[in-house]
């Protein structure tokens, strides 16, 4: 059997791929303190959940440090959308659902190649809850993604099959939103996919 890939090297490779895709589409990066949103701007807060914080089931290094940054800039936005990874138990993207497979290996699902993850962000668990202390007083909508048991979902706009849409693009356009700021976890996956799909949907996009 092929040895499982080293997690650090694997994530570095994916991060480099996401960075290249971001550079190719010229998505600007903004420091939180320099943001000046207007009434046609929206903030998308991506997956700031316990599962991605230190001690969670799929932790991102310093994943708890995004909370004060987001809290500091949130009051400037009249329009905030929140996403949550919200998997069913036994989700197809979990390594535990595939005999002989380990986390960070890959398999082929109906829509193509899929990275297999540790069980994480299972619906209704504390692991899937938003991180304590996150304060978003003007949040208007929560997009829960990954609840389709057979399809993974990174982006707030489209599932990983690249066919199933969440309706977020229409929601934003109906409210006259032109510019989308994206912040949260993790930059190399759900933040990157959300930002790239926002650009594809016709919005001006900045990653925080």
Roles of regions detected by a PLM:
Residues 48, 85-86, 185-187:
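Active-site metal-binding loops of divalent metal-dependent hydrolases
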Residues 1-18:
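N-terminal secretory signal peptides and thylakoid transit peptides that target proteins
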Residues 42-43, 81, 206:
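Hydrophobic "anchor" residues on beta-strands that sit immediately upstream
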Residues 53-62:
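Acidic/histidine-rich helix-loop elements
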Residues 192-199:
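Histidine-anchored nucleotide/phosphate-binding helix
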Residues 181-184, 204-208:
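A short glycine-rich beta-strand->turn/loop micro-motif centered on a GG-aromatic cluster
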